[in-house]
Amino acid sequence: MIRLILTDVDGTLTFDRDTYNIDLDAVDLLRKVEKKGIKVGLVSGNSYPVLRALYTYFGFNGGIVAENGCIVYYDNQLKEVCERVERSLISEFENRFGVKGSWQNQFKVCDFSFYPPILKDEMVKWALDKGLYIKTSGYAVHISKSKRGKAEGVRELIKMHGLDKAEVVGIGDSSTDIEFLEEVGIRVVVGNADESLKSIGDFVMREKSGKAVVEFIKKVITGEINE
């Protein structure tokens, strides 16, 4: 039985993978599924303040995993599950490689993002030398001290709910969602997702991004999926 649905934001709740515009039809259906007793949470690389605002205005109640798994919020509890990255290293990375830090970095403490989203070999070497992990989501290059990415936060959130992973759905679009989906019982992948993510999906939807969420949630509401 599904008790919790966790969804990525960018490329999943948006209209497409190249826009920040949220598909409100997807949000509306997720609200409806909450009324049926299934909680909904957000899992993203975005900062906690950004996700907390979306979460509040969307009317969700299943919790938040922010900064690619490093910050977890549920039931008025806020936890950091990753080690913080020194701000001096963020400045050094920007200056050394000529990248631009995200405007959200000022609100982050563990996972920092940079543009353009192009990962170079010399960046990987620099990060390893500094004891950091580096990856690209396709939206930005991310630096943190977390090896498992979103998985750590998702695991903690499920624990806070007191649920088994079999009771949890995960929805994503990017290769950075692989670790996240490996922590849940039902893996849902939008139709325009990275092929590496599609390869592990239980449900690979026909529609893309937000419309794929609509496609899946309709199956949950009608009872077609909720075993």
Curated annotation (Swiss-Prot):
Required cofactor names: Mg(2+)
UniProt: Mg(2+) binding residues: 8, 10, 173, 177
EC number of this enzyme: 3.1.3.18
Catalytic activity: 2-phosphoglycolate + H2O = glycolate + phosphate
Enzyme class: hydrolase
UniProt key word Oxidoreductase: no
Keyword Endoplasmic reticulum: no
GO MF assignments: magnesium ion binding; phosphoglycolate phosphatase activity
Family classification: Belongs to the archaeal SPP-like hydrolase family.
Entry-linked PANTHER family: HAD SUPERFAMILY HYDROLASE-LIKE, TYPE 3, PHOSPHOSERINE PHOSPHATASE
Name this polypeptide is given: Phosphoglycolate phosphatase
Organism: Sulfolobus acidocaldarius (strain ATCC 33909 / DSM 639 / JCM 8929 / NBRC 15157 / NCIMB 11770)
